[in-house]
C-alpha cells in the first residue's frame, strides 16, 4: 500500500493509477483461509485511511473487485456474493446497485474519456 501511496502522491492531474490486491483472492479467498482473509482486511482497513488522506481536490478513488469470494464457503471456486463498489473523492455519491460497465463509465467520465456505445 505504501507504493500505491507514492504513486498517488506523484500522479499527474488527469491520470489513472490502478492497483490490484490479488492476495485477497489468491492467498486467502480461494484457499479458504478465513483467519488470513480477516487479517488482510484489517490491514487494508487501516491502510486505506492513510491513502484517502493523500487524495487531492479532484481525485477519485474507486474500490471494487471482479467477484465475491467468501473464504468460509466449501470448495475453491468463486462464491455467489456481489462485489462492493466504494467511491470517495470528486463525483462520489450513492450509486445503488450497479454493474462493471457503470464502474467503467464512472471512471471514464472522471477522466473525460468517451464510453463506446
PLM regions and their residue ranges:
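Feature captures the catalytic ectodomains and active-site-proximal regions of enzymes
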Residues: 1-117
Amino acid at each position: 500500500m505504501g507504493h500505491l501511496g507514492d504513486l498517488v502522491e506523484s500522479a499527474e492531474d488527469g491520470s489513472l493509477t490502478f492497483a490490484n490486491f490479488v492476495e485477497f483472492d489468491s492467498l486467502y479467498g480461494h484457499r479458504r483461509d478465513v483467519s488470513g482473509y480477516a487479517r488482510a482486511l484489517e490491514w487494508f482497513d487501516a491502510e486505506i485511511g492513510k491513502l484517502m488522506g493523500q487524495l487531492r481536490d479532484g481525485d477519485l478513488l474507486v474500490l471494487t473487485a471482479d467477484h465475491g469470494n467468501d473464504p468460509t464457503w466449501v470448495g475453491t471456486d468463486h462464491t455467489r456474493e456481489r462485489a462492493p463498489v466504494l467511491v470517495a473523492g470528486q463525483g462520489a455519491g450513492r450509486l445503488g446497485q450497479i454493474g462493471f460497465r457503470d464502474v467503467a463509465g464512472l471512471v471514464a467520465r472522471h477522466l473525460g474519456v468517451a464510453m463506446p456505445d
